[in-house]
């Protein structure tokens, strides 16, 4: 009987420790240095009064954060979009899930020789990324601004072959995404990934057009908070996600990144 009571006490103690770890304490999160770790540092300020300490582990690659999350070295990670996570799960056999979207980095149309979209004329040259995912995004932005019309249901897999209408006969040149900023002097406009635009010294505020928060691309490629399947109801992770999508975090993104990083959840 004594042994049974001791065993029960030990079991209750372990359950108590597990619950207390989730109800307060340290949350370990993996992240890319910019902007993810910076946004997490802001979220940490909101978590502290709730009894949570955020430990941020920075990674410079896109594989180890998921490996570490799967092996329980991390409680969550924040660096990727859901299509990447889904592909990682398929390739590695992991069971990681999204707790929700946090932010997106909008594509923009930037001026080259043409200083506004109205300056585009017959045969104007438009540079777009040459990789499949980003080219589709660029073409969807062109469609949203009325420059072209795509075939029905082309979606994010769209290529130049899916252009159904091109009233101005725009010439579309496919260029490596990292080289698009350099191409600006030689083209009329270029459609550039948010990260490359910033690295190239461009300001999103100066873009001729940018993706809207409710666009297919922005919702699909929003950066997410990833966790292990089964952890969705953990109070600490719910608190972390709430902090990341708070009005305070949204204001921080808008102020610090000047449009290059925007909250996925409108505040």
Summary of predicted features, one role per range:
Residues 20-28, 47-49, 117-123:
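Immediate post-signal peptide segment of exported/extracytoplasmic ligand-binding proteins
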Residues 24-34, 52-58, 125-126:
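Short, well-ordered beta-strand elements
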Residues 56-67, 154-182:
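Short helix-initiation/N-cap motifs at beta->coil->alpha
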Residues 58-62, 72, 77-86, 102-103, ...:
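Beta->alpha turn/N-cap motifs
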Residues 87-99, 114, 186, 191, ...:
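Ligand-binding "clamshell"
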Residues 99-148:
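A conserved helix-loop-strand patch within extracytoplasmic ligand-binding domains
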Residues 106-117, 221-234:
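A bilobed periplasmic-binding-protein/Venus flytrap-type ligand-binding module shared by bacterial periplasmic
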Residues 136-143, 244-264:
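Periplasmic-binding protein-like
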């Amino acid at each position: 009987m004594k042994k049974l009571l001791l065993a029960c006490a030990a079991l209750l103690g372990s359950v108590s420790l597990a619950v207390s770890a989730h109800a307060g304490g340290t949350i370990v999160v993996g992240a890319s240095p910019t902007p993810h770790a910076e946004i997490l540092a802001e979220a940490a300020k909101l978590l502290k009064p709730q009894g949570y300490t955020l430990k941020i582990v920075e990674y410079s690659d896109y594989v180890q954060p998921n490996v570490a999350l799967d092996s329980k070295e991390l409680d969550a990670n924040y660096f990727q979009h859901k299509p990447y996570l889904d592909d990682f799960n398929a390739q590695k056999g992991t069971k990681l899930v999204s707790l929700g979207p946090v932010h997106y980095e909008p594509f923009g149309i930037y001026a080259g020789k043409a200083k506004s979209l109205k300056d585009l004329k017959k045969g104007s040259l438009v540079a777009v990324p040459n990789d499949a995912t980003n080219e589709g995004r660029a073409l969807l932005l062109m469609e949203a601004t009325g420059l072209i019309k795509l075939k029905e249901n082309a979606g994010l897999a769209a290529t130049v072959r899916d252009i159904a209408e091109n009233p101005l006969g725009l010439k579309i040149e496919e260029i490596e995404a990292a080289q698009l900023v350099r191409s600006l002097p030689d083209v009329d406009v270029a459609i550039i990934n948010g990260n490359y635009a910033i690295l190239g010294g461009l300001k999103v505020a100066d873009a001729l057009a940018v993706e809207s928060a409710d666009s297919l691309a922005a919702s699909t490629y929003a950066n997410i908070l990833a966790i292990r399947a089964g952890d969705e109801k953990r109070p600490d992770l719910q608190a972390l996600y709430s902090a990341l999508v708070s009005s305070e975090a949204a204001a921080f993104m808008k102020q610090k990144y000047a449009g290059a990083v925007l909250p996925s959840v409108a505040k």
